[in-house]
Design a protein with these regions (language model features):
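Early extracytoplasmic/lumenal segment of secretory-pathway proteins
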Residues: 7-11, 19-109, 119-120, 226
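Second-shell loop/turn segments in exported
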Residues: 37-41, 85-86, 92, 120, ...
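Solvent-exposed loop/turn segments at secondary-structure junctions
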Residues: 46-49, 79-82, 100-104, 138-141, ...
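Alpha-to-beta junction loops
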Residues: 89-95, 153-155, 216-225
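A conserved helix-loop-strand patch within extracytoplasmic ligand-binding domains
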Residues: 107-180
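Short beta-strand->loop
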Residues: 116-126, 234-250, 258
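A bilobed periplasmic-binding-protein/Venus flytrap-type ligand-binding module shared by bacterial periplasmic
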Residues: 130-139, 252-268
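Ligand-binding pocket segment of bilobal, Venus flytrap-like solute-binding proteins
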Residues: 182-247
Length: 268
């Protein structure tokens, strides 16, 4: 769950994005006389609940403004995997991915036009999050900061950076702590981060799968997680889990884009 002060910004940004796609589709793929259109939003793992909420707001907004119904299909998974799926043919009208680099992959295969990052406010990053630790109630391992994740015997759960955008932010947050602790000594930073990943018990393909491993399968002592994912878990299981905010984290900036080539192929 994102901070309340962020909600209006998120809503406006998503409305702008979906509105843009809706305008393009209005008189093309759905036909002038049809009363329903379809938008496919390919997103990263832990955004299901966010977009379920805002899809409903957008549907009501679009119906009131244009008198047409809109069906928004959601697709979720690890951010890198989702980008590759679009490249391989997944029919995405909109991508809302965890990393700008994942979206940029679509430009390399000409699915996005150059300059896409400047098409929407905030360099096409409508909201931010950060990285936190989710631990079991009472914090039995007394985990307070990144150095605790490197201690012998601590079992860490984090997704795979090869497929998960959130996992990349996790890595960068750990690296940032290493910079704070070891300054410019890159070898010490590398060894520190390596020691954390040496404690990883399970490395799932995406952030939601990692949460499932920690929460439902009861594996690990600490989950490195998106703040919104951790907050949602504590809200659902207040007697089982708690959040630890490390001394150093990172400003994670997910990125959105309209997939130009797919929109044009649909006659827009």
């Amino acid at each position: 769950m994102l901070k309340k002060l962020k909600v209006p910004v998120i809503f406006v940004a998503i409305i702008i994005l979906l509105y843009f796609v809706g305008i393009m589709r209005q008189n093309s793929k759905i036909g002038k006389n049809k009363q329903k259109m379809e938008i496919v939003n390919v997103s990263y793992d832990p955004t299901r609940e966010l977009y379920e909420r805002y899809n409903g707001l957008f549907k009501a907004y679009y119906k009131e403004k244009y008198g047409k119904d809109v069906n928004i299909i959601q697709s979720h998974g690890g951010s890198g995997s989702q980008a590759r799926s679009v490249i391989e043919g997944l029919d995405a009208d909109v991508v809302t991915l965890a990393l700008e680099n994942d979206v940029a992959l679509l430009e390399k295969v000409d699915l996005l036009e150059k300059g896409w990052v400047d098409k929407f406010p905030g360099s096409s990053s409508p909201y931010t999050s950060t990285i936190v630790f989710l631990v079991r109630k009472g914090n039995p391992q007394n985990i307070k900061d990144w150095n605790d994740l490197a201690k012998k015997g601590v079992k860490v759960i984090t997704p795979d950076p090869k497929s998960s955008g959130g996992a990349c932010w996790n890595f960068l947050a750990a690296w940032s702590y290493g910079i704070e602790k070891y300054g410019k000594d890159e070898n010490k930073i590398k060894n520190f981060v390596k020691s954390i990943y040496g404690n990883v018990a399970v490395m799932d393909s995406g952030a939601r799968a990692a949460t499932t491993t920690f929460v439902e399968n009861n594996q690990g002592d600490v989950l490195i997680a998106w703040e919104n994912e951790a907050i949602a878990t504590v809200k659902e299981y207040p007697d089982k889990y708690q959040i630890v905010y490390p001394s150093v984290s990172i400003l994670a900036q997910p990125t959105v884009a309209v997939v130009d080539k797919i929109a044009k192929n649909d006659g827009t």
